[in-house]
Amino acid sequence: MLKSSWRKTALMAAAAVPLLLASGSLWASADAIQQKLADLEKRSGGRLGVALINTADDSQTLYRGDERFAMCSTGKVMAAAAVLKQSESNPEVVNKRLEIKKSDLVVWSPITEKHLQSGMTLAELSAAALQYSDNTAMNKMISYLGGPEKVTAFAQSIGDVTFRLDRTEPALNSAIPGDKRDTTTPLAMAESLRKLTLGNALGEQQRAQLVTWLKGNTTGGQSIRAGLPASWAVGDKTGAGDYGTTNDIAVIWPENHAPLVLVTYFTQPQQDAKSRKEVLAAAAKIVTEGL
C-alpha cells in the first residue's frame, strides 16, 4: 500500500514538472521581451511606448503602456470613427459633400488639394485622412464634428477617458515633451482600436468600413508592417511629428491566429530629430515573435 501511494505521488509530481517548466518559460519569455524592448529603446536614443493585445486570450504586452505620448496622425482614426458613428442613425452623413477652399489647405494635403473645385464627401475625407494621412481632410472632419473637443467626447463615449484631442492639424503634431495636449497612452489607444475594429463600438457596417480604410493605408509599409510576416493582413494608421515622433497603430490578422492589436509610439529628445520608422518595425517583430 505504501509503495502504491509513493508511486502515485511520484507520478503526480512528474506530471507537474512540464507545467512548471512551461510556466517558467512563459515568464522568461515575457521578461525577455521587456529586455529586448528596453535595449531597442536605449539603442534608438528616444522613448518607446508599446501595447499589444492578443485577442486569443486577452493577454497584453506593455512597455511604457500607461505613459502619455503625442498621438499625431494616429488620432485620425478616432475622428473617422466619430463620423462613422453618426452614420449609424443617418446613413447619408458619409455622403455629405464639404467645400474645400484654398485657404483650408495645410501642409501635407495630397488628396484634398486636388479637390478645390469639387469638394469631398465625408467618406472621401475619411479615406484621405486614414489612407494618405491628409491633414486638411482631418481638419475638415474635425470642423464638421464641432471641434477637437467633440472627437475627445466620442472617445469618452466608447470608454476612453485617456484620449484627448486639443488642436487641429498641423499644430497637434508639436509633440512637446511633457505637453499633455493631443496625447494618449499606448494601452488606451490599443483598447479603443480594438473596440472600434473588432468590438461593438461601431455598427457592423461602420466597423467593416473602418477596417477597409485601415487595410488600404499607403503610409505604413516601413513601420509595423515591416516587422511582420508578409502573409499577415494588417490595417494601420501612422503618425509623425516634431521631436522625431514616429507612431503607428495597427490591427493584425496573423495566419491561423486570433487578431492582434498593436500600438507603437516613439519620440526623441531633439525637436528636429528625424522619423525612425525602423524602430516601430523592430518593436513589432519583438512582440510578435513566437506567435
Swiss-Prot record:
Family: Belongs to the class-A beta-lactamase family.
Catalysed reaction, written as an equation: a beta-lactam + H2O = a substituted beta-amino acid
GO terms of biological process kind: beta-lactam antibiotic catabolic process; response to antibiotic
UniProt lineage: Bacteria, Pseudomonadati, Pseudomonadota, Gammaproteobacteria, Enterobacterales
Positions that bind substrate: K237, T238, G239
Alphabetical keyword list: Antibiotic resistance, Hydrolase, Signal
Disulfide cysteine pairs (residue numbers): none
Protein name per UniProt: Beta-lactamase OXY-1
